[in-house]
Amino acid sequence: MRVLRLTPFFHHDCVTAWPAEFDAVGGMQVQILRLSRELADRGVEQLVMTVGFPGLPRERVDRPGLRVRVTRAPLPRLRSELTGLVGLNQAWLAAVLTACAPLRRTWRPDLVHVHADGQLWALLAGPLVSRLVGAPYCLTLHCSRLASYEPMSRFDRLQHRLVAAAERYALRRARRVSTLTSRTADTVARLLPLDRALVDVLPDSVGDVRPVARPEAEEYVRSLGVPAGRPVVGWVGRVAHEKGWRDFVAMAERWDAGSGAPGAVFAVVGDGPQRERMREAVEAAGLADRFVFTGFLPHDAVPSVMTALDVLVMPSAHEELGGSALEAMVCGTPVAGYAVGGLRDTVGSVTPSLLVPRGDVAALTRAAGDAVTDAERHRKTVAAAVPDLLGRYGADTVERALEHYRLAVGRASGGGAGWAP
């Protein structure tokens, strides 16, 4: 089977540095890379068209059956606090349409797989490219405007209806749809309406993330500048508005008086378009000596980081599933956060007392503090849940994806995904 994979977001683990203006690596990028490799190992031939950044080869063979092509039209380097660069995703779509025009003759796919994150441009890619290459498309909602997305700015709020309409359009014309959670699948099927049997749930996979020995993990974070002798409260991922970094800083301001826990150090592991804004907020709060910013780290460092944390904090505005939460818990670390989206299913099924209403910074501070002061109880609870987490978010993800592809390719042509007008 040949699959053309279209996604602005893809993890390039062949490099050790990642320019933040090209939208720093996050969970979606890592998950798509992981899925692509697992499918290639199962014999699915794939061509990935993604944004990339200067310094990457224009095209590379990641492994047999998996080619990754940097597909981006030229654009001025005007910084954006939401997408890294102004027009980055538009430049990707323009280049994709140009690159796909000859594919019908040179490398015709059996299926186009589009990965959408709640932004307009990937949603437009499916219907347009499907027509260009003469193949059906399936659509994965890594974040859904209809089910979980929260607008990130005033302009984003203004265009929210437009993008939600584009999501409906793309869903109705997809041969098959997948979501990360049953919650989103049910919501999307109800709102369109769409035959629920045509929406598959393909959650993120934890892959080979496992805990490392605690002394080794602590030594690693010390090498990043995290001091010894104090609890480590962590943030892992993209530094962006929707991840709630402002509330993380506000929590740190309240920590000494409101957490009930010893004085902590706050480790920010990752990068993103609002990194400098977060640094400025930390300095303005007088907390510069309590924060460590590691910047971008290769994903193979995640097990060491997650193992070394006393608690991972996720104050996200919206979170479709929360891959970082899964990785932390598999490594034995409790997670405190807001009860939004998929965190209600992942963290909520393990330590529900550590989830609090979105925006309640005081409650978030108390929850994170409880994870530190009552560490033995919470860690025992998390450890007991690991077998179930590995079962739900482990090796069978690739089997589900293969079945999803078989159903999409084998379905009789004509019409969309069984939608009712």
UniProtKB/Swiss-Prot annotation:
Matches recorded under Pfam families: Glyco_trans_4_4, Glycos_transf_1
Transmembrane regions listed in the UniProt entry: none
Swiss-Prot/TrEMBL keywords: Antibiotic biosynthesis, Glycosyltransferase, Transferase
Pathway(s) per entry: Antibiotic biosynthesis; neomycin biosynthesis
Transferase keyword on record: yes
Coiled-coil features, chain-numbered ranges: none
InterPro entries: Glyco_trans_1, Glyco_trans_4-like_N, Glycosyltransferase_grp1
Superkingdom of this protein's organism: Bacteria
UniProt xrefs under CDD domains: GT4_WavL-like (cd03819)
Enzyme class: transferase
GO MF terms, alphabetically ordered: 2-deoxystreptamine N-acetyl-D-glucosaminyltransferase activity; hexosyltransferase activity
EC number: 2.4.1.283
GO biological process, one term: neomycin biosynthetic process
Catalysis: reaction(s): 2-deoxystreptamine + UDP-N-acetyl-alpha-D-glucosamine = 2'-N-acetylparomamine + UDP + H(+)
Functional summary from the UniProt entry: Glycosyltransferase involved in the biosynthesis of neomycin by mediating conversion of 2-deoxystreptamine (2-DOS) to 2'-N-acetylparomamine using UDP-alpha-D-glucosamine as sugar donor.
Similarity comment: Belongs to the glycosyltransferase group 1 family. Glycosyltransferase 4 subfamily.
Protein name: 2-deoxystreptamine N-acetyl-D-glucosaminyltransferase
Organism the protein comes from: Streptomyces fradiae (Streptomyces roseoflavus)
Gene it is expressed from: neoD
